[in-house]
Amino acid sequence: MNLSIRGAIPLLFATGLAQAAPVHQHGRAEAAVAVDDATLTLSFRAPLMDILGVERAPESEAESHHFQEQLDLVVAPLPAEAAGCTLQEEKVTDLAALFPAGDGHHHADDHDHDHDHDHDHDDHHHAHHQDLEATWTYQCDHIAELNAVTWPFLADFPSLTTEVILLLPSGQGARTLNSGDTRLPLE
């Protein structure tokens, strides 16, 4: 089976980045850096708790605006300038995807009355965990010059430690970006 590096990134997330960090652990983010020929793919996943402060739908317009501001902080990482990388594609989970219409507090519209009524209604808002996911794809003119990637948004989320899987021409590896670290050396 011939699987491209780019295609492998979602698989890494699905398997907990090869067990580098347990799936959905508050305070721990997962990232991947993959180089395939001249293509650089960067992926990031973090618990919403560490990005928004909560893992539930916004309860007001003001809260919705605040959540969007927090999501907007997650900007494209910066590959080393010498590599000559140009951003080709960016996918960041947006607020509408995290909390689809009708996924909020409208129980009358989507409540199944055939289930056990002994549950706690608060569980609807707090029981499941959600993650922010982002992927950036770059084309690089001088991929051999790629010696670092800076993740500027990590400075905005000091509660996070980020486990990074590396899939590079020189080999595979793992690194940790501790709270406050934004620059990931690749050498």
Region spans (language model):
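Catalytic-core segments of enzymes that bind and process phosphorylated/nucleotide-bearing substrates
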Residues: 12
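N-terminal signal peptide c-region/cleavage motif recognized by signal peptidases
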Residues: 15-18
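Bacterial N-terminal signal peptides that target proteins for export
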Residues: 1-9
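N-terminal soluble domains immediately following signal/targeting peptides that reside
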Residues: 21-110, 123-187
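Intrinsically disordered low-complexity segments with strong compositional bias
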Residues: 110-118
